[in-house]
């Protein structure tokens, strides 16, 4: 039993299997479809939290601009879905049929050249994965090669998220502006609004999330993961050993961007829209909170942290519409101050030892030999014997 308890610890196969059981069996059987769809949306954010565990927890680099890569992945998928929904027959009432409605409203008469690759689904998938990763490579290479890290890197990533938000809002004729891209209903002719489609998208999201955890766990157990930890704690020693610290950090940043882009694309499929409100500074900071609450050193904990924070956000906003922001802040501060290592640290430092002690006591009580039955008491007979006569 002790092995099972340790087996279910953070970043272990047991923790991954337990999470898989919760996501694949427990939640679909216990939640109605609307709530399950919300969980699927929350799991899209969990991809960003996984990337932050690798970048921040293992690499020691805090990024406050992960919403940029989440938004690029989401907008890439939204562009393909919007073009599919803007076929000439559906948009025949427009001045220029065959282009998105917001382009027609802004008197654009032809599809821009940089939109054309998103008419192909395979090319769209390739761009969703490569464009955010390439942007992360450019930013990371420029910063880490100049040994920019710490709070300076965090501020720069915040600035990038602000720039992208302003760019999206300002180019209303090409991006939909502040309203974003809406009415994204079909994927390759498949209606994503039906109950069966939502259920399928949920399980696809779960499958990709579990695969991402396996990938990140493999990286953590490899020499690369060891080097990331060493660079976080003793950067100069790793550099003096002959390793290029900058390129390893660039890799971690690119991996985090890749995972965030996957989450953004799945988010667009789940909810049917994409807007600049999911790209800016505030959502980027919220994504850091997901990893901090779950535990920035735990992949599985990051998923639980994402679910907990978003579930609390949903409950508080429904029950206390005027106070939910303060309650969310109080929850975050309470968790961070009481448990600096997040939910995963709470499990390993408090819950796991408690379970081990309980199992040990149960074993001791079962292994203790039973006391032999006491002999019956000797009762003196009142009948006189022959020796008394």
Which residues does each PLM region occupy?
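Transmembrane alpha-helices and adjacent helix-loop boundaries
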Residues: 1-389
